[in-house]
């Protein structure tokens, strides 16, 4: 019975990790339909969550204060942009848009935090491949949209 429980728990863990990995693919692998506003909002809120996470990682490190401020600015700009898109595309009022964007950003922040924690446990790396990939993607996107680093 104990062996069956262990096998069941192991399978459940594997399945849940695969579901998380599937749902939290790198942004550069997300299929983008240029006319789908939901994708624009999703990507912008993911970038906002990423920059919030990066701000939290860097703000307490010696010599990283300026970089932490940059991440904080990018987080704020992406959050504002996502809320504006929610107002434009979803016809949300400003309070609803801010609330939904804040919740989504917090959820993505937690996903990045969990993802980085798993990477540290698995191979000792500070950042996961998803986090590294998304960081490059979001930095590129922000440069294209004239958000300076």
Show the residue positions of the predicted features.
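Compact alpha-helical subdomains of small soluble proteins
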Residues: 74-149
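Short N-proximal segments of mature Sec-exported proteins
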Residues: 32-91
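Cleaved targeting-peptide boundary
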Residues: 20-29
């Amino acid at each position: 019975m104990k062996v069956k429980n262990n096998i069941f728990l192991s399978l459940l863990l594997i399945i849940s990790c695969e579901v998380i990995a599937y749902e939290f693919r790198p942004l550069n692998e997300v299929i983008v339909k240029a006319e789908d506003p939901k994708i624009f909002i999703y990507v912008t809120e993911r970038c906002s969550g990423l920059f919030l996470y990066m701000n939290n990682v860097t703000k307490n490190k010696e010599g990283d204060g300026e970089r932490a401020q940059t991440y904080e600015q990018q987080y704020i700009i992406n959050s504002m942009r996502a809320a504006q898109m929610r107002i434009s595309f979803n016809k949300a009022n400003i309070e609803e848009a801010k609330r939904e964007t804040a919740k989504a950003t917090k959820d993505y922040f937690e996903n990045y935090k969990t993802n980085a924690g798993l990477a540290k446990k698995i191979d000792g790396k500070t950042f996961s491949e998803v986090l590294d990939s998304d960081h490059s993607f979001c930095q590129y996107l922000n440069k294209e949209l004239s958000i300076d680093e």
